[in-house]
Amino acid sequence: MDAATLKPIFLRRVETEFAPGDVEHCAKSLKNAGRKATAEQRIELAAAMAQAAFLAPDQVGQTYDALAQGWRGFAVAASPIETLANAPVGIAPDGLWDSWWSVVEDALAGKLDALAITQRTAALGEWMPDDFVRKVAASSHLYPGISDAAQADLPPHMTLERLATCPPGSLGRQFHDLIVDNTFDLEVLDRDALGLSALPKPLDFLNTRILQAHDLWHLTAGYETTALHEIAISAFQMAQFGHNYSAQFLSITAAVSALTPARGAVVLLDTITSAWVHGRETPPMMLIDWESELDRPLDEIRADYDIAPYPRPYPADLIEKAGEITAFAARIKSLFSRFFRGGRTAPI
């Protein structure tokens, strides 16, 4: 089924409120159908993900818990994430869904590289009113540990000079080598250029810290820097503190998978749900004072904070190796290979 046929189905469904039971049923139906799942079934789940990301950010937790339960067959072993009181599903600004769908279509056509997909997804945030940003900020407090973490001052910049002093085998030395060997930017993006300090609390702290600690999370939580694991760590981050950019990004991913062979959707949902559950069942990493842990071995840090490595359902480099096998893999590789470094990211 082509994009023009699926778009009206998406538009009709995304404006109809999803209850958690609806999401669970949708995910369960997709799981049971496997590679025979229809494009209509897959776009319905993408609509649920988009609704949570853009219209009901406080419902991201219950939406993904329901998705994981429907897909995996059992509940997340963590306390439910509550929703905000008196916060109904919002109304989409005129033009939002047309812009969102154009990103999906261009991604499907292979027109977007890592920089472009980051910029286009970030630009969707420009459609959202100030009230939405305030709602995202309030929703962050629904996640364990976030209210406490956000009491801290904005963290100082890390430097390669400091990391170079860390002993061999330490987290800081691994972080240093990852940045240098791959010519990554140390803090991913320039926090000052993005104006992160002007965001409402706790988004100022959360967005500054995750840009700074993104690769520390990769190392500590056991995610590699491959295309598939960038998708996975997006779900992990979302489970940890409701990262709205990740929610928006994954909704686009789901829509792209609805327009490609169903076997790609199976890999995608296995990856998203396993990483979401991993994030939900991992203690809040936003509470870690990373600066004081840099000289310590990674295994000790994991043990002290009760952090288990990601239980990956597929080899981390699956997309890189399968790029010539499926249309979905080819599209996803161009979209997600180091997407978080591609350019200006949405500050929410």
Residue ranges of predicted features:
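Context-gated lysine
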Residues: 7, 28-31, 36, 111, ...
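Core of folded catalytic or high-affinity ligand/protein-binding domains
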Residues: 47-309
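Charged, amphipathic alpha-helical stretches
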Residues: 1-42
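Acidic, carboxylate-rich catalytic segments that either coordinate divalent cations
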Residues: 280-348
